[in-house]
């Protein structure tokens, strides 16, 4: 699958596990400054979801209807299944995280609309800094 279509800006995906060998998918994802993925949902009948282990730079994580969370190295974000969210780099920083796909029953990712530029830019303003 070509994931670039689900990102604004450039990101780099480095799988850390082989799905033929390991049931848990881990990947290092690096976002260039300003890069973010689209809103998306990790669906699962049970279990599922995603963990983000922040490793470098500064980024954002946001769930639909909630304020964005500023991400820094060492932080771990737990995203249950069925939560609409997005994540990516801040405008002035590269950002990397290890993405862990939590095993579950009948899991599937649904990619949705892009995070619009105005909403993203508002996060970067001093009043919007979280």
Where are these regions (language model features)?
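Short strand-connecting beta-turns/loops that link adjacent beta-strands
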Residues: 21-22, 46, 66, 92-93, ...
């Amino acid at each position: 699958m070509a994931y670039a279509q689900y990102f604004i800006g450039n990101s780099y995906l480095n799988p850390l596990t082989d799905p033929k060998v390991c049931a848990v998918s881990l990947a290092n994802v690096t976002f260039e400054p300003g890069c973010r993925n689209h809103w998306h949902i990790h669906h699962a009948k049970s279990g599922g979801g995603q963990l983000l282990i922040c490793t470098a730079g500064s980024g954002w994580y946001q769930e639909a209807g909630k304020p964005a969370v500023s991400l820094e190295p060492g932080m771990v974000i737990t995203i249950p299944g069925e939560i609409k969210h997005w994540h990516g780099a801040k405008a002035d920083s590269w950002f990397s995280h290890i993405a862990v796909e939590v095993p579950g029953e009948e899991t599937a990712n649904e990619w949705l609309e892009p995070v619009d530029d105005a909403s993203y830019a508002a996060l970067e303003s001093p009043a919007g800094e979280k």
